[in-house]
Amino acid sequence: MILRYLDEALEGERLRRSDPYEHAVESMLIAKEGPITMAGYVYVMNQDKTQRETLNEKLLSLYRDINNFLMEHSPEGTFLFESFGLAEAVFTPVFKRFWFLDYYEGFELPVGSDYARVKKWRAACMAHDATNQVTEEEIVKLYYDYALGAGNGALVDGRKVSSFAFQPSWEKRPMPPRDKYETTASDEDLGLFVMDITFNAEDRNPIYVSPNSG
């Protein structure tokens, strides 16, 4: 809904298809975003190893469904239509967040006709110049707590800092451990630390001091 509003409100070429039939087609594809997003988040937050195969198959079934849709409406194309459009703008952030599944669950789309078309589409979406705001390293580091079952900024037991903390920046942190089922990294392991807050006696401006600053 927000993307549709921005597409209509901002200046520039519209992503939304102007042809009523084509807009209906892209809307049908966009409607598939919710279920696949939910399946991906349930998968990455899962803490029960016995459920991995079930969750993996659930996500694969949704990819197969999108593959079938693309084969019906754009079997030879790269995008749904001739260029990156509204459907691609909706799905690309999801595909990029799913880097956390590649890293923490070893997820990958199988080789074969059931996935070939959606793999082509996904790769084109993620390679588009307009989608380079985030990197795989950033997603993997920020979403570590999700991989341990703690979403929306919740703290993992025994931790004092969320992996979504702004400081220290993700670029300065080490990569988290891949094995989320057997290993739980500490704040120190993740390059996170609690900031002690003191105040300047004259102007009361806060001064942030790292415990390791001496």
Per-region residue spans from a language model:
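Activation segment
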Residues: 6, 98-99, 135
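GST-like domain detector, emphasizing the conserved glutathione-binding G-site
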Residues: 1-83, 119, 150-214
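GST superfamily/GST-like fold recognition
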Residues: 81-105, 114-119, 125
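Short acidic/histidine-centered micro-motifs embedded in hydrophobic/aromatic stretches
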Residues: 29-32, 43, 92, 137, ...
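Short glycine-enriched, charge-decorated loop/helix-capping segments at active-site entrances
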Residues: 45, 107-108
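Membrane interface segments of multi-pass transport proteins and intramembrane proteases
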Residues: 16, 108-111
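A contiguous, mid-protein "functional segment" used to position or interact
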Residues: 113-155
